[in-house]
Amino acid sequence: MRIIFMGTPDFSVPVLDALVAAEHEVVAVYSQPPRPAGRGKRDRPSPVQARAETLGLTVRNPVSLKSTEEQSALADLNADVAVVVAYGLILPQAVLDAPARGCLNIHASLLPRWRGAAPIHRAIMAGDTMTGVCIMQMEAGLDTGPVLLRRETSIGAEDTTGTLHDRLSAIGAKAIVDALSQLDELTPKPQPDDGVTYATKIDKSEAKVDWTAPAPHINRQILGLSPFPGAWTMAGGKRLKLLQSRVANGTGALGEVLHGLTVACGDGAVEISRVQPEGKGAMDAKDWLLGARIAPGTVLE
């Protein structure tokens, strides 16, 4: 098939690789423009653009797809289908209609649950035990289109947004290849009206740990915000990101370190096993404790 691929972050890269490996003809890759990054704040291409250039594919970086010039250029590609994975730009109706078979989106949730920008974070933070990927025929609404194919996976007790992100990316890559091979046989199923929830974008204000909350809530917050933006607390006057945890037994003052890095909460405790100190990389909590001088009885803020 002649495919237009639209994607930007790391999540999208395995999907592009899978389409190329399946010997589809990727006629163009659309990705958001390079952005300043790193200490030097030099423009850096998106992960998708970097991978596409390695593969020798044509890359386009429009700031918007609203102009008639951009829409005409896309239509002139005469694509059979567009595959859209975390692209980040709104697709006008003219773009949705341009490919012969329309635009297919890979969405990282079991629609209609968690429509929107942050479905992986929200699933973990809500305590969901199942999630998955949907291949959806795109329409004008936000993740409202009929679903062609669904693939499920369980959310484990130790899953973070990082681990689930990688797993769902791989599932999505296989699912879109399967969907394209069965496109004539698959029947798009409208999403039900019941069970709609929205995965709003994560706000950095959600990352500060409130030790008055119950342990299960704090544990889900830590796992759901790991690795980015990272739930955090103050320890010894410095910000400490909390990256991995589990619910534990124990009682004490709110935010009190009971032993190791097991911390008392509003109800129960959480055992934190991986952290990222301010200005440093991620490390095991036990290694951080060796130099942090955080003794039992210390209160995290």
UniProtKB/Swiss-Prot annotation:
Stated name of the protein: Methionyl-tRNA formyltransferase
GO molecular function: methionyl-tRNA formyltransferase activity
Family: Belongs to the Fmt family.
Reaction(s) this enzyme catalyzes, per UniProt: L-methionyl-tRNA(fMet) + (6R)-10-formyltetrahydrofolate = N-formyl-L-methionyl-tRNA(fMet) + (6S)-5,6,7,8-tetrahydrofolate + H(+)
Biological function: Attaches a formyl group to the free amino group of methionyl-tRNA(fMet). The formyl group appears to play a dual role in the initiator identity of N-formylmethionyl-tRNA by promoting its recognition by IF2 and preventing the misappropriation of this tRNA by the elongation apparatus.
First-level EC class: transferase
Enzyme nomenclature, EC number: 2.1.2.9
Keywords from the UniProt entry: Protein biosynthesis, Transferase
Classification of source organism: Bacteria, Pseudomonadati, Pseudomonadota, Alphaproteobacteria, Rhodobacterales
InterPro entries reported for this sequence: Fmt (IPR005794), Formyl_trans_C (IPR005793), Formyl_transf_N (IPR002376), Formyl_transf_N_sf (IPR036477), Formyl_transferase-like_C_sf (IPR011034), GART_AS (IPR001555), Met-tRNA-FMT_C (IPR044135), Met-tRNA-FMT_N (IPR041711)
Pfam families the UniProt entry points to: Formyl_trans_C, Formyl_trans_N
Coiled coil: none
Keyword Transferase listed: yes
GO cellular component terms, A-Z: cytosol
Organism field: Jannaschia sp. (strain CCS1)
Binding-site residues, (6S)-5,6,7,8-tetrahydrofolate: 109-112
